[in-house]
């Protein structure tokens, strides 16, 4: 159901402030039966105290049984139907990087990967190289591959193993399958067109993959590329129009900046490299008076899960917990903490499991949940929500929705 027409009628501007904190991939699983999840293993005294004052529940970001990507997971949290408002990873990276991304262009998100002599994937992320190494390799590709046939090829560094390619030329469609096999021990997949208009794009992507491998054959780790999320530039309703908010985003990684800008948030500058939690906290404090909705993104919980690093994910949760008192001191009227999907270290991948949701607001019914964990969230008064149901709840608790109906 598309609630946007209804919310557009009911939304009203108020001075109250909403803070949505997304701990990327926060949901987890025990490493062994009966053991703790990452959240249960973490020492989180500040989150524990907050949970006692808040309402908890579980949230299925997109749909039961579906393991969502960060794109649909976030869009649902922002109130956008992820089955209607579809955007590829390439477009999100292009928007987040501020790349020269024009109508008719096709953007693809790339991973530098390590391939063995037989062309099989050894490491899908090339050992997560420093961004400086990425920049060096991208410079090499820019010089060696300015175009494929008569189509311009534009390379951009994103971060670590991530990069962006923008294809510019005539007759390019974006209905193209990914080349990332999503596991090691297999060669990169061949891109395939899903419609007639995208046949040329698929062929060019395959040629580009071969050419990149030739250029990078002497690189010890970054000697191949995996592509996904081919997409053109989309146009979505803006949060200002639908919710009457003045929204801001605090994120470090281009994809999440792209998601935020796509729905109308102003992306605030963040000092520091990587997840830069201290820089994000500084940006939140310095801009607190200018906006009434803040999206605050924490990435490394997801990265540790994808690497299968259970204890690393525990540490990232604990690092966030240490910042929480300074965040709470700002006094948000409505605070929500949740995830865009689960990334259990046990699975080393996004999963279909619900994520915990914590909501603190003035008019909440008390519940029995005492920690921000998956098991405790099951006891909470919020029940089990879908991702798209979160934004109306935040708006209501912030006093930003009028009564519906007579």
Swiss-Prot record:
Keywords: Glycolysis, Isomerase. Coiled coil: none annotated. It catalyses: (2R)-2-phosphoglycerate = (2R)-3-phosphoglycerate. Gene3D superfamilies: Alkaline Phosphatase, subunit A, Metalloenzyme domain. Pathway: Carbohydrate degradation; glycolysis; pyruvate from D-glyceraldehyde 3-phosphate: step 3/5. Pfam families: Metalloenzyme, PhosphMutase. GO terms for biological process: glycolytic process. GO terms for molecular function: metal ion binding; phosphoglycerate mutase activity. Its EC number is 5.4.2.12. It comes from the Bacteria. Catalyzes the interconversion of 2-phosphoglycerate and 3-phosphoglycerate. Belongs to the BPG-independent phosphoglycerate mutase family. A-PGAM subfamily. This is Probable 2,3-bisphosphoglycerate-independent phosphoglycerate mutase. The gene is apgM.
